[in-house]
């Protein structure tokens, strides 16, 4: 399989993971009362921040690889 295809697929996945975490954070911040299953808003946002940081770290890592 072409390395470029793999690299592009990984970038797309990590960008999607990052966008998902950022969207969740925006929802929690704009309407925390509407999220019934998350009584710990700080914990829920912290979890999404961790996901965002992890996705960004992966993006940075593959950008620096010698393909």
Which residues fall in each region the model found?
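Extended, charge-rich alpha-helical interface modules
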Residues: 2-67
């Amino acid at each position: 399989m072409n390395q470029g295809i793999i690299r592009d697929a990984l970038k797309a996945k990590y960008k999607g993971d990052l966008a998902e975490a950022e969207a969740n954070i925006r929802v929690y911040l704009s309407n925390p009362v509407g999220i019934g299953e998350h009584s710990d808003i700080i914990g829920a946002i912290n979890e999404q921040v961790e996901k965002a940081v992890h996705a960004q770290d992966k993006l940075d890592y593959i950008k620096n690889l010698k393909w």
